[in-house]
């Protein structure tokens, strides 16, 4: 029983699908991030843009005219979100197909002076980590116990989605492996047939040559 509890705890820790980082982009540069997301899972992206100030040699809050164009594509390369946001915001979308989702960001401004840079702070949260439970408790008037039960139910639901996604990946990998093995087999058979045909042709050619020279 204790070992089962430890396994569940480790699995819950592994599901902590949130990452915070920052990156620099230039005027026309495009940055993309890949996030593996199960189906019917909420993803929230928080970002903040800072503009490089050469006078202070640091990054300052960007002007209101500078924003970010955000584009999200699902595992089928279908655009599920594409629009221009302000210099700081919160983006939310729900996946409808499991797999790799590509989140791309680039500036909507092309009027910067030469050498300007943007620093973009980015935080991506997936699954139950994207839910604001304080807001949920206030909106639905939940007690502390009810809220905790709600969190546990969401975690179980996320674990189920993750398991289904892993099964989906295993099935896709197995299908790819079987397809590759089948192609290798047919290619080997084709090579064998070609070699046999070439050997047969060479034997007939040599026989004709020897007969022409009256050696046989």
UniProtKB/Swiss-Prot annotation:
Membrane-protein topology: Single-pass type I membrane protein
Residues covered by the GOLD domain: 30-126
Cytoplasmic side: 204-216
Residues making up the signal peptide according to the UniProt record: 1-20
TM ranges: 184-203
Coiled-coil stretches noted in the UniProt entry, renumbered to this chain: 134-164
PROSITE patterns reported in the protein's UniProt record: GOLD
SMART domains: EMP24_GP25L (SM01190)
UniProt xrefs under InterPro entries: Emp24-like (IPR015720), GOLD_dom (IPR009038)
Lumenal side: 21-183
This protein's GO CC annotations: endoplasmic reticulum membrane
Chain positions of motif Prevents secretion from ER: 213-216
GO biological process, one term: dorsal/ventral pattern formation
Intracellular or extracellular location(s): Endoplasmic reticulum membrane
Pfam families recorded: EMP24_GP25L
Assigned keywords, A-Z: Coiled coil, Developmental protein, Endoplasmic reticulum, Membrane, Signal, Transmembrane, Transmembrane helix
PANTHER family from the UniProt entry: TRANSMEMBRANE EMP24 DOMAIN-CONTAINING PROTEIN
Record's function text: Eca and bai are essential, though not redundant, for dorsoventral patterning of the embryo. Specifically required during early embryogenesis for the activity of maternal tkv, while the zygotic tkv is not affected. Involved in Golgi organization.
Family as reported in the entry's similarity comment: Belongs to the EMP24/GP25L family.
Protein's name according to its UniProt entry: Transmembrane emp24 domain-containing protein eca
Organism the protein comes from: Drosophila willistoni (Fruit fly)
Taxonomic classification: Eukaryota, Metazoa, Ecdysozoa, Arthropoda, Hexapoda
Name of the gene this protein is made from: eca
